[in-house]
Amino acid sequence: MRQKTRRILLLVSLLLFPVTLNFFSPYVSIDGAMAGVASGSLLLFVALAVGAVFFGRAWCAWACPMGGLAEYGRAVNDRPVKRKPLAVLRYSIFGVWGAFVALGFLMAGGVKGFDPLRLTENLVSVDEPVKYITYYLVLAVFVVLTLAVGRRGACHAICWMSPFMAVGYVAGRWLGIPQLRIVSEPGKCTDCGSCDRRCPMSLPVSSLHKRGAVRVSDCILCGECVDHCPKKALRYGVRGR
């Protein structure tokens, strides 16, 4: 039931993507920065970072519109991915984008205000035919990468939001703030590998949980490992550092 609910939430988020696209747009953040204002997308990215202090990357599994595409892409290509090379690419993209945002604010003389509806004055991102080009291009990039690379391939390779949440998660852990995590009773584990096979992020859950909890920023708290563990060795819980 939990996984069905999660997939329904992701589907709803995906269907709403024509409305919400600009709030996830890295371009809108740069456009706002060049005008000296924090746009809705930049404010959302910061909010995701703050939320990750307490909830890690749960957003990715339960609410991200592109997460919906990734979930359904597994039906075509469920191959585990090599996380480290893709992480280098993802953080490189994030670094370049962050540099443009910083440069934009610098050229504008700093942050002069906030504009949550920048480029979205009608409250709908895709509000005229020409904007469908951007919309379908974004969808195409995520679909192609997901199908070509494997499990959540686009998330691993190009997602510009996940670094914000990774920073929030690491900050929360470093500060010892109680965080939602996948916790375990290692004594119940029989090393059957079910959790590894089910993990959409290609994490080696069977080894990560042996210290009592999964403590990595790539865990998106989807609960696949929890719901498919035959020995009920895994569950959701709150842990500090």
Protein language model regions, located:
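Non-ligating segments of multi-cofactor redox enzymes
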Residues: 1-220, 224-241
